[in-house]
């Protein structure tokens, strides 16, 4: 039985992945991981992308146009389909994911942490970034988030888990991308992630490391520019992927996860899965 973790590092453009994440690239060089280019939906806005990642639907259908108007989505999604199939799910993410796929509005006391066997999110550990601004991005330590996901794997026995961190997206908005601060931030993230990724693999998980969207040189995303839309997709697992010159469709991620985990894809997810076995 395939167990899978989806790690989303928010707002990292393709070029920064390929030149600054030395541990990930080292695994690719050794043949222990595969990497492809993936393209975000339009608008390439954070909440719009989150909704598309798990429903397989474009924003023009799920109607999350921007980072406002967050609501419980009415469509089948990765969590709902896995839970129906008897899988145990986990989330260590921004609170938007809980609102989209479990309940809204987010109640910080009720929803900051929950264990609900009936799902759709069996084990949720969330953060809000309340008070976020240019001078203080209010992001939790990524080391702590990776540790929390690892605990869900080892103590709760999750079959599927998602981790989402806004650290690099928030820093990109503040410092832009062609600067020493962002070079170091990507380097630090790569080094922090690596030992956890090794441990997840030792525990029998396939792992995807990717982004929701990119950012351009001025720290912007939402539009059509290649830097705003394109990011890397690293896969640690046994399936094949399409040829390296084929850009992966973000809308295919949800049906690909379900297919890889042996769960039926709902008819609302119309993009063809890209895993080949």
Placement of each model-derived feature along the sequence:
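Feature captures the catalytic ectodomains and active-site-proximal regions of enzymes
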Residues: 1-277
């Amino acid at each position: 039985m395939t167990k899978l973790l989806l790690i989303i590092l928010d707002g990292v453009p393709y070029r920064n992945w390929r030149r600054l994440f030395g541990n990930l690239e080292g695994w690719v060089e050794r043949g222990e991981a595969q990497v492809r280019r993936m393209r975000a939906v339009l608008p390439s806005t954070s909440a719009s992308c989150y909704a598309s990642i798990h429903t397989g639907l474009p924003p023009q259908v799920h109607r999350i146009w921007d980072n406002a108007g967050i609501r419980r989505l009415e469509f089948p999604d990765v969590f709902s389909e896995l839970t129906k199939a008897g899988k145990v799910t986990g989330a260590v993410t921004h609170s938007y994911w809980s609102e989209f796929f479990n309940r809204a509005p987010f109640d910080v006391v009720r929803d900051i942490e929950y264990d609900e066997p009936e799902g759709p999110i069996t084990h949720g550990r969330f953060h809000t970034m309340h008070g976020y601004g240019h001078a203080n991005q209010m992001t939790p330590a990524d080391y702590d988030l990776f540790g929390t996901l690892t605990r869900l794997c080892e103590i709760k026995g999750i079959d599927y888990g998602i981790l989402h961190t806004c650290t690099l997206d928030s820093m990109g908005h503040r410092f832009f991308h062609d600067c020493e601060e962002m070079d170091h931030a990507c380097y630090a993230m790569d080094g922090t992630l690596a030992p956890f990724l090794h441990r997840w693999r030792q525990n029998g998980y396939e792992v995807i490391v990717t982004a929701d969207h990119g950012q351009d040189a001025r720290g912007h995303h939402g539009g059509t520019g290649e830097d705003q839309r394109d990011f890397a997709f690293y896969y640690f697992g046994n399936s094949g992927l399409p040829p390296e010159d084929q850009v992966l469709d973000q809308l295919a991620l949800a049906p690909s996860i379900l297919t890889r985990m042996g769960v039926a894809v709902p008819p609302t997810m119309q993009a063809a899965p890209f895993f080949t076995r």
